[in-house]
């Protein structure tokens, strides 16, 4: 029987560099801020930036108007519900065109046309 040789593998030490966030500059307080973010993960720095963006508020406005429109239709307030939905859909179309999200704008246009045809045929 052949002699079995043992292979010794040296331990590999891989150091992963600490990633500094781009929101804090190197200062005495940066470690303290990093610790605070770690201890309080409810609102991260990315979430703070998202909330401050104009797109966030436009998308939230579209969402709120369309939900209120849907609730109005669900509870039988048809005219107000349809008008709220129409406003929301129009804002969506314009917003998606501005953001160059053409498939979504086309989808909203098709929804607008089919809904208007449905309202016309059922009134």
Curated annotation (Swiss-Prot):
Gene Ontology CC: membrane
Transmembrane segments: 67-87, 104-121
Cell compartment(s), UniProt: Membrane
Record key words, sorted: Membrane, Transmembrane, Transmembrane helix
Membrane topology of the entry: Multi-pass membrane protein
One GO MF term: nicotinamide riboside transmembrane transporter activity
Name the record gives this protein: Transmembrane protein 049L
Provenance organism: Invertebrate iridescent virus 6
């Amino acid at each position: 029987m052949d002699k079995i040789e043992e292979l010794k593998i040296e331990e590999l030490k891989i150091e992963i560099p600490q990633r500094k966030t781009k929101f804090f500059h190197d200062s005495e307080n940066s470690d303290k801020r990093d610790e605070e973010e770690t201890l309080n993960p409810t609102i991260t720095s990315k979430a703070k930036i998202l909330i401050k963006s104009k797109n966030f508020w436009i998308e939230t406005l579209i969402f709120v108007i369309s939900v209120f429109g849907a609730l109005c239709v669900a509870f039988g307030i048809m005219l107000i519900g349809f008008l709220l939905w129409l406003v929301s859909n129009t804002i969506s179309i314009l917003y998606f065109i501005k953001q160059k999200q053409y498939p979504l704008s086309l989808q909203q246009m098709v929804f607008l046309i089919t809904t208007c045809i449905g309202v016309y045929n059922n009134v």
